[in-house]
């Protein structure tokens, strides 16, 4: 069938993802190729000290994004969008959307970005002996209880953004396990065919005196946990009108479990199998490694535990700083060239990046005895609440552009490696391959450096730019899979079997160079500390 026939017959699959700056919709065909898309640009607001998105804008954004998708389909294929084989909603994880029994929002949406739940996070992490970050839904929920907030007594349901939108469309109070793992810790059933909130943690939470007085039960307040591929309900008449106010969309469409952006990222990079992982490296950087078993201990503030969309534990290392500092240096150098040659005669910024970063491959093994810290903000992993970008050199340093650029590229990975060393050295976690996405990987050098820093092969896929909404559309397609393969088999055999990718193995010379830098980086943290205290 042609794409037009696939769409008109209702056999395309839809993924919609609420990102922090854009809501995006992607329609895919039976070959998992994106064939139409829509988007809506938005920004969070800081209101009364709370990072939030207005509930009306959430609704408007969804409808505008869908209308943009309809328009794209009409323009490309001259088809009016009326149905899908399956659809799914994903969104930024965590946060707090609290409703009463009549579905009235009790307080403005508190997003993952808020750092207002420190007391709850610390108390729960200690209670569970399990990392419960400030951004998790249960941290927000418990903090509201600790604060004696007026709305708490009226709470009937707490959702993530994806679970809330799914409820609006289907009337089903359910959530995909990956998204659920950012609300409250989860666990497999004995047969590994289902997942739920960890029973012993639920009991401990509900036994807290401050929780008991309200009679809250986690499994009543939080959505029911579903695995990837499960039936998560169907689009209702009201849901269809809500998504498409023009009235063309039909009710009865199958919906898959709503997921979080971490889970859709894993799917989009084919990183759901044990011993695999993915790295997103841009302004900030995080790695996610699928575990074969639970970690031996908790590492609050350093390693978070979430799950794949089919319930396997994932260790997440998140760092606030990656390419931001070397972007400033690039712009600084570009300004020098523009001043000397005139902006009309100087290279465009993309070419400028490529040439300078590739020049770093000519650097000395010890990076010329240079050192840099890219701490535009604090870095929890290395113990900094705030940061100061630094460039330091010894008196006998070989200060040239190749060494300078390499140390900037290595600095982007220093804190990430500190977190990964816990997995490698303390927990003995095996990692056979990782897949990268983001600006750090735009050059061959970036891919090489990441492989050496992570001590494992790292690949960049040609599909990496498709991102979360494409991953959500794949999860929607997976929910219709008649063969009921495992998610990893489905991705390997159906989606990525012929996917082109560029893989970099750890290079012996560059690996030695990184290790020399890394030892200097750890020793030099005292310099960074002095800068924070003095400047």
Whereabouts are the PLM-identified features?
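A polyampholytic, Gly/Pro-enriched intrinsically disordered region
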Residues: 126-139, 276-278, 478-493
């Amino acid at each position: 069938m042609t794409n037009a026939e696939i769409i008109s017959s209702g056999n395309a699959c839809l993924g919609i993802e609420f990102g922090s700056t854009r809501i995006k919709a992607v329609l895919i065909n039976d070959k998992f190729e994106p064939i139409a898309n829509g988007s809506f640009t938005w920004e969070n607001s800081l209101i009364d000290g709370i990072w939030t998105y207005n509930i009306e804008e959430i609704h408007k954004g969804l409808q505008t994004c869908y209308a943009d998708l309809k328009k794209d389909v009409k323009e490309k294929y001259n088809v009016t969008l009326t149905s899908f084989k399956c659809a799914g909603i994903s969104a930024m994880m965590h946060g707090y959307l609290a409703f009463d029994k009549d579905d009235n929002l009790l307080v403005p949406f508190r997003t993952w970005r808020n750092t207002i739940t420190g007391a709850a996070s610390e108390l729960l992490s200690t209670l569970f002996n399990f990392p419960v970050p400030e951004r998790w839904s249960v941290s927000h929920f418990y903090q509201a209880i600790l604060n004696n907030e007026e709305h708490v007594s009226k709470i009937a349901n707490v959702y993530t953004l994806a679970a809330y939108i799914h409820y609006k469309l289907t009337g089903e109070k359910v959530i995909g396990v990956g998204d659920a793992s950012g609300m409250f810790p989860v666990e497999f059933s004995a047969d590994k065919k289902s997942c739920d909130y960890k029973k012993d943690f639920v009991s401990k939470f509900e036994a807290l005196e401050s929780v008991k007085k309200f009679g809250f039960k986690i499994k009543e307040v939080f959505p029911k946990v579903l695995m990837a591929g499960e039936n998560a309900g169907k689009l209702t008449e009201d849901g269809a009108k809500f998504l498409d106010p023009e009235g063309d969309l039909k009710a009865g469409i199958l919906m898959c479990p709503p997921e979080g952006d971490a889970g859709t990222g894993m799917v989009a990079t084919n990183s759901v199998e044990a011993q695999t992982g993915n790295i997103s490296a841009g302004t900030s950087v995080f790695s996610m490694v699928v575990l074969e078993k639970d970690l031996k201990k908790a590492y609050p503030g350093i390693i978070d535990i979430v799950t794949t969309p089919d319930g396997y534990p994932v260790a997440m290392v998140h760092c606030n700083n990656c390419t931001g500092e070397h972007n400033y240096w690039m712009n600084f150098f570009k300004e020098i060239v523009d001043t000397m040659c005139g902006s009309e005669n100087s290279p465009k910024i993309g070419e400028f990046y490529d040439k300078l970063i590739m020049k770093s491959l000519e650097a000395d093994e010890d990076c010329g005895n240079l050192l840099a810290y890219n701490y535009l903000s604090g870095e929890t992993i290395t113990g900094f609440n705030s940061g100061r970008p630094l460039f330091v050199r010894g008196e006998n340093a070989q200060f040239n552009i190749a060494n300078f650029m390499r140390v900037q590229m290595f600095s982007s990975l220093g804190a990430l490696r500190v977190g990964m060393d816990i997995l490698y050295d303390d927990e003995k976690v095996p990692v056979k391959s990782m897949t990268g996405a983001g600006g750090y990987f735009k050059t061959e050098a970036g891919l090489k450096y990441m492989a050496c820093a992570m001590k494992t092969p790292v690949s960049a896929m040609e599909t990496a730019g498709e991102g979360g909404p494409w991953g959500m559309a794949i999860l929607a397609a997976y929910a219709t899979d008649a063969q009921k393969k495992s998610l990893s088999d489905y991705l390997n055999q159906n989606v990525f079997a012929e996917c082109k990718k560029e893989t970099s193995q750890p290079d012996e010379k560059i690996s030695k160079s990184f290790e020399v830098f890394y030892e200097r980086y750890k020793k030099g943290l005292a310099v960074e500390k002095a800068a924070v205290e003095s400047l």
